[in-house]
Amino acid sequence: GTCQMGYGGSVTINGGTVKATAKGNGFGIGGARIYNTGAMTVTINEGTIEATANRNNAAIGDKGKGESGVTINGGVIHAVGKGGAAGIGSKGDIRITDGELTVSAEGSGAAIGGFTDSYSERVDCESITINGDVIKSISSKDGACIGAATGGSVGSITISDAELPLLSSNKILIGWDADSPGGKLTIRNCRVASTDTLSVLTDGIRVGSNSELVIEESEIRLPHLRGIRVGGNGSIAVRDSDLHTYGIFMDENAKSPNDAKTLKRLEITDSTVLTGDIIGARGEYSSVEEIVIRGSIIRLNDEYTYNRCTIGGGEKASFGSIDIQDSQIDSRSSVNAVIGNGTQSQSYGESLIRIANSQVSVRNELFGPAIGAAYGSSGGQINILIENSTVTAKGGNLRSGTDYIPGIGKNSSGRASEIGKIQILNSTVESFRLEEKDGTNYVYDKLHTKELPGIPAENITICGSTVNGKTIDHSFDEYGKCTLCDKYDLGYCYEHGLLTLEGLTDCAHDGSEKKLTGLSHQTGENETKQLTENTDYTASYSNNVAPYTLTPEDEGFDPAKAPKVTLYGTGNYCGKAEHYFTISE
């Protein structure tokens, strides 16, 4: 093999065996202690490498004032950082695409990422890119396994197509916790797990303020007390993934309203989440603008002794909207609403809870409703919309013998929290309250008779639904508009030939998904409205690729195999319609 020293401090290793130890304040392999003004890069293409940094900087790395970076394209590499050193570190870009790496940091440095330099100054990494199953073992103490040194940040981290089954750290596993001007952490098509046993709440995957965290097509297994967390003004997106985590949240615990922080957006799409704590904002004065849950399953991890999960804002804070569609939620909470805001929340605007096309079972264990305004909250207006769903909600224990806590809404005692409108459309809802203080006997509350604390009867709409065993049907005109809820019902419109579906006739198999190209509704004798997806309706498909030529009228028709589109009303539309179609050979 060869080892080349380039002008300005660049190092390239193409093979052989290299053992390097920095006993003082230098790098094991890479930049010198007195930092060069030119380019200082390290490239490893092959070889067997053992490198150690005993005090600071990195076992493999650099800190040039010009171009700076570490690139690893192969090799069997063992890198150890001690003191403030990283195992592999750089001021610039770290890119790892191949090889077999065993990396550790035994002090404040990251195993891969940031470190402390010879002048005791923290060095933050611009970017870290890891592609492929290259990490065989990685551990750290007070810095991250992959990310920043203690108190530092990273510009961006991208980890893809990787197996990381044995992460171990006293602090963060992946990411950083410092305030930052804006960074992004992306984990895509990975399996991430940790074997740590913890006694206190510790961040698992974390980014600081003003940053974005994205998890896609991945399996994340974090041990008890490790969560997925962002800082203030951050956002989280989880897509097509399977997560076991203590929670998914912003946790800021501000001391006063002047220090209040906000989670901008939390999205969970087509994922399964097994959790034991908050999904949304956690702590005092911690608000959330938007929570979007689509096609996902969220339930409690029975292994957790503290086993309560809320979806929404933190204490003394607020939320903008919680939109749950095509999902399954099974959870319980204490004091905070399971779906809604935290205790003593203060809001000055309107908030929306929407549950559509979903199955929800939630229970509050203390003082508040399961869905709506938590105990002690005040101001603002929470609107609740339930459509095409099955919901069971149980209110919490009473504060006194005269208290009344419904499953959905607000409790009768405490501050004058506001519930605006409750709309229940095309759904089956059971809303329970405890009959007496410290009791165990649940009975239906009076949602079905529209007699809930602090909510005028005219603000409660129930249509095409069964609530607490009482069925209230729609009342349609000839074009499918209900005179009670003032919405058009897609089911009625479809059954009476008022809908025209485009793009699903004469479909031929070509390997592509067959979907609607248009949907229109006859709203009058000579009037037709073109409907807009995600405004008037949403659509879900099944079996819409493979050939299938039987219709519901044909002998041998199998609905489990037939191409189908299911339309769900939203906005000015409600209800659902199912349409089977054929795909020719």
Show which residues each predicted segment covers.
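Solvent-exposed beta-strand/loop surfaces, strongest in extracytoplasmic domains of secreted
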Residues: 469-585
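Surface-exposed loop/turn motifs in large extracellular/passenger domains
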Residues: 1-22, 29-53, 60-81, 87-106, ...
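Substrate-binding N-lobe of the ribokinase-like
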Residues: 144
